[in-house]
């Protein structure tokens, strides 16, 4: 619709058919009129050829009329041909202008499409770059969290191992202490039992001695 609105006003200003109608409706008139001297010379030649003065003048006037009509027709044909050539030239010029205008519009539309495509490609590239950066950032955060979690787990395992070792050491120490205490108790018990046996033996010996 835009192209038609822009082209049709141009054509309305240069309508070739209006020129043709104007040419066809024009009335051409003879622009050729022989000089009086030439007419007199023609009459004298006819008189010398044997024609009377009246007949010579009649023939001269007739020839003048015929020549004028012939020249008028020739002038009309030449003018019509010139007008046709002018109309054809105007049509060619109009078509060339239309073609140039359409090519310009096509180039402009192509430029617009190309610019839009370039803009879309740039936006896509920016989006890709942004997504890459986001993915890299997310992966970095995940790796960092994993490393931190691994570190925490390692620290926790180390702490547990340390606690276990400390507990084992404490238990071994307690066992050693308990073992020493048991040994001491055995020694004390043996000493007490030995003393008790000695006392009982002494008592028995005394009883046997007196009784």
Swiss-Prot record:
Gene3D superfamilies: 1.20.5.340. Keywords: Coiled coil, Membrane, Mitochondrion, Transit peptide, Transmembrane, Transmembrane helix. GO terms for cellular component: mitochondrial inner membrane; mitochondrion. It is found in: Mitochondrion; Membrane. Its main location: mitochondrion. The keyword Hydrolase does not apply. Disulfide bonds: none annotated. It comes from the Eukaryota. The keyword Metal-binding does not apply. The chain crosses the membrane at residues 191-211. GO terms for biological process: calcium import into the mitochondrion; mitochondrial cytochrome c oxidase assembly. Belongs to the CCDC90 family. This is Uncharacterized CCDC90 family protein C3H1.08c, mitochondrial. The lineage of its organism: Eukaryota, Fungi, Dikarya, Ascomycota, Taphrinomycotina.
């Amino acid at each position: 619709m835009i192209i038609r609105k822009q082209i049709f006003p141009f054509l309305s200003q240069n309508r070739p058919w209006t020129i043709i109608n104007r040419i066809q409706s024009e009335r051409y008139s003879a622009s050729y009129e022989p000089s009086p001297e030439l007419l007199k010379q023609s009459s004298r030649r006819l008189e010398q050829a044997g024609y009377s003065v009246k007949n010579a003048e009649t023939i001269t006037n007739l020839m003048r009329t015929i020549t004028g009509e012939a020249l008028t027709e020739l002038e009309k044909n030449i003018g019509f041909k010139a007008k046709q050539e002018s109309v054809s030239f105007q049509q060619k010029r109009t078509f060339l202008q239309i073609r140039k205008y359409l090519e310009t519009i096509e180039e402009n539309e192509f430029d617009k499409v190309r610019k839009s495509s370039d803009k879309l490609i740039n936006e896509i590239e920016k989006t890709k770059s942004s997504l890459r950066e986001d993915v890299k950032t997310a992966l970095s955060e995940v790796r960092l969290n994993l490393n931190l979690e691994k570190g925490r787990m390692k620290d926790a395992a180390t702490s547990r191992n340390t606690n276990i070792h400390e507990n084992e050491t404490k238990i071994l120490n307690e066992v050693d202490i308990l073992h020493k205490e048991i040994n001491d108790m055995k020694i004390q018990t043996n000493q007490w039992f030995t003393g008790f046996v000695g006392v009982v033996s002494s008592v028995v010996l005394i009883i046997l001695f007196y009784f």
